[in-house]
Design a protein with these regions (language model features):
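Conserved residues in the N-terminal Rossmann fold of short-chain dehydrogenase/reductase
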Residues: 81
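Oxidoreductase cofactor-interface core, primarily capturing Rossmann-like NAD(P)-dependent enzymes
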Residues: 1-78, 86-91, 134
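A hydrophobic C-terminal alpha-helical subdomain
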Residues: 84-145
């Protein structure tokens, strides 16, 4: 979820940019949730040896994110789909292939199963996570460049 701060300049203008079509869902996770899972795995290493988990606290479209940003900040946001050519220039061919795969196949997580496996981790949904941020400072810092 913290990846949203990479677009501070655009957010300051009321634009949320993403690489997927505005109605394509993508799983997202907060850094705090990754840390909480890592602690649990380290504390109970024997139980988790050889296991692999996809992590997500929420699954949202670009339109979902803009609606949440508008509610949380009290400012209107619009979605802008970043062209793959721009992604390719900024992130290289591997980055472009990753987003092509997200669009073609999707990245979704069995969140109910994840919560059963890690019941003590309070996975954040995007809106509750967004409410913890200082949007005034974040949006001002993005507009100052």
């Amino acid at each position: 979820m913290e990846n949203i701060s990479f677009g501070k300049e655009q957010l300051a203008k009321g634009i949320y940019g993403g690489t997927l079509p505005p109605t394509r869902k993508l799983a997202q996770i907060a850094v705090a949730d990754i840390g909480a899972v890592a602690i649990r795995v380290l504390e109970e290493a024997g139980r988790f040896t050889g296991k692999r988990y996809d992590l997500a606290g929420d699954e949202l479209t670009g339109n979902d994110v803009t609606a949440i940003l508008s509610r949380v900040t009290g400012r209107p946001f619009t979605y802008y789909q970043i062209p793959l050519d721009v992604i390719r220039q900024r992130m290289g061919e591997d980055g472009a292939k990753m987003y092509e795969w997200f669009d073609r196949v999707g990245f979704m997580v069995d969140r109910p199963a994840l919560r059963r496996e890690f019941p003590d981790v309070a996975f954040h949904d995007f809106e509750s996570w967004a409410k913890t941020l200082d949007w005034k400072a974040l949006l001002q810092s993005g507009g100052s460049k």
